[in-house]
From Swiss-Prot:
Enzyme class: transferase
InterPro entries with a match to the protein in the record: 4Fe-4S_dom, Ac-CoA_synth_d_su_TIM-brl, ACDS_complex_subunit, AcylCoA_decarb/synth_gsu, AcylCoA_decarb/synth_gsu_arc, Dihydropteroate_synth-like_sf
Cofactor-binding details, from the entry: Binds 1 [4Fe-4S] cluster.
Oligomeric form and interacting partners: Heterodimer of delta and gamma chains. The ACDS complex is made up of alpha, epsilon, beta, gamma and delta chains with a probable stoichiometry of (alpha(2)epsilon(2))(4)-beta(8)-(gamma(1)delta(1))(8).
The 4Fe-4S domain, residue ranges: 1-61
Protein name: Acetyl-CoA decarbonylase/synthase complex subunit gamma 1
Top-level taxon: Archaea
Cofactor requirements of the protein: corrinoid; [4Fe-4S] cluster
Reaction(s) catalysed by this chain's protein: 5,6,7,8-tetrahydrosarcinapterin + methyl-Co(III)-[corrinoid Fe-S protein] = 5-methyltetrahydrosarcinapterin + Co(I)-[corrinoid Fe-S protein] + H(+)
Amino-acid positions noted as binding [4Fe-4S] cluster in the UniProt annotation, renumbered to this chain: 18, 21, 26, 43
Length: 468
């Protein structure tokens, strides 16, 4: 992105405050463009009226991310990679979380192939209010047989996940494309030997393609430039992923050099980068658990340092879960704390005799409290107070959590302790104990201070509920 101020974007907008974009003013819409929560296409006059055509083209150019965004697959499950503007998250944020594709082989028996693909599609982990999922399937042409590869692609495509076609044989890639023309797969890969044929396939079928040159950044840049000049825009870079020793160090350095050059304005290499942690299985490690461990280490390194897409092998939870959790953490937007909607939530089927708790709407706090309560079979009411996504202790200290805020949260939820319960009692977090007196005055209720840690709620309830 070449501009970072709403004022700079504003001068390219119609400046009529028509409201067709859903914002009251063009300046408000400009702010959405800068934080990438809005698109130029959301402004109908800018798109439809010819007099704004030049402004639209220039604004699109200025708003384009430094690293090109590439889409793999189609529909709701399509995987977007790249699209970043900064080297360090705290300067803005990272966009498009690292995508994790898991391998299958066209040599697998049909039942085993379908079982593994379904396992990839069904793998999920509930984490801080959302389900973490795997992103796609990388189909390896181990047989080097076009017909066999096409048959495997056809089976995998039925599941609906984005796909990577893995072969250096253009005939094999073409066979896969013929049975998945409308699936927008990523081709892996074009190298110094097959670049012309693979490039022609990418142009003919309008699909993204990986350019692969191991440990030679000049060669990689040259090949990417050749493809771009031929009209291929959706390019992914593979500088090689060595699994150990000096090779791994060189790989790490190459990723840094590529991303730094792209962010600093070298458009010839400003593309998403592919990492291949599954090379850990080629490092001579005989024990599968140890190989999975090392694959996870490599995946972690390149999640933190600019790997936009990865091909992995191990689907064991002890390998996949750390990879998924790390990616989710690194790609959390630091500008906006992860939060849940404020309001009154039911844990189980509470009635008028059930206890009433409150916590803040910081997602990690809320789901920890909710989990500790529900896992121990406690039926209750749980109020999430909107503190702008800040945890209890920090919100009390910063003034985001006050007795007035709690009262307002009860009113917005339409919940009255006097009429909706038989006990008129509120249990508050131990870290907000200083609010007890104010809350009793503000709510006209009996306020009890709960434990400092939600894990102790079951023991506290056993000793202190119902109130005497």
């Amino acid at each position: 992105m070449k501009i970072n101020s709403p004022l700079e974007a504003y001068k390219y907008l119609p400046q009529t405050n028509c409201g067709e974009c859903g914002e009251p003013t063009c300046m408000a819409f400009a702010s959405k463009l800068i934080d990438r929560s809005g698109k130029t296409s959301d402004c109908p006059p800018l798109v439809k009226e010819k007099k704004y055509a030049k402004k639209l083209a220039e604004l699109d150019r200025l708003l384009a991310p430094e690293i090109r965004q590439v889409t793999i697959g189609v529909g709701e499950k399509a995987a977007n990679i790249g699209g970043d503007d900064v080297l360090y998250r705290h300067k803005l944020t990272f966009f498009n979380k690292t995508k994790m594709f898991f391998d299958v082989s066209d040599n697998m028996e049909e039942d085993a192939l379908i079982e593994r693909v379904k396992k990839i599609a069904d793998f999920k982990k509930f984490y801080v209010g959302r389900n973490l999922l795997l992103d796609g399937v990388a189909i390896k042409a181990t047989s080097n047989d076009p017909a066999k590869f096409a048959a495997a692609v056809k089976k995998v495509a039925e599941i609906g996940l984005p796909m990577i076609f893995c072969s250096f044989n253009p005939a094999v890639l073409k066979a896969g494309l013929e049975v998945a023309k409308d699936k927008n797969p990523l081709l892996y890969a074009a190298n110094k030997d097959n670049w012309k044929e693979v490039g022609e396939l990418a142009l003919e079928y309008k699909v993204p393609v990986v350019v692969s040159v191991f440990n030679d950044l000049d060669g990689l840049k040259s090949l990417a430039k050749t493809f771009a000049e031929a009209g291929i825009k959706d390019i992914v870079l593979d500088p090689g992923t060595y699994p150990s020793g000096k090779g791994l160090k060189d790989t790490f350095t190459n990723f840094l050099k590529i991303r730094r050059a792209g962010i600093m304005g070298d458009t010839e290499i400003a593309y998403p980068i592919m990492a291949l942690p599954l090379t850990a299985w080629m490092a001579g490690i005989s024990d599968p658990v140890s190989a999975s461990y090392w694959e996870t280490v490599i995946a972690s390194v390149f999640t933190i340092r600019y790997g936009d897409i990865m091909i992995l092998h191990s689907l064991e939870p002890y390998a996949a879960l750390p990879e998924m959790h790390l990616a989710e953490t690194i790609y959390t937007d630091p500008r906006t704390p992860v939060s849940v909607d404020g309001g009154m939530y039911k844990v189980g089927e509470p009635d008028k005799d059930s206890p009433v708790f409150f916590t803040t709407n910081f997602a990690l706090t809320y789901y920890t409290v909710e989990s500790d309560i529900s896992a121990n079979g406690i039926v209750c009411w749980l109020l999430a107070v909107d503190t702008d996504g800040i945890g209890v202790e920090a919100a009390v200290a910063g003034g985001q959590l006050t007795s007035a805020k709690v009262k307002d949260a009860f009113e917005k939820a339409g919940f009255d302790l006097k009429t909706d319960t038989n006990h008129n009692t509120l249990i508050i977090p131990g870290l907000s104990a200083r609010l007890q007196g104010d809350l009793e005055d503000t709510l006209g209720a009996n306020v009890k201070v709960g434990p400092m840690d939600s894990g102790r709620i079951p023991g506290w309830v056993e000793k202190n509920w119902p109130p005497k």
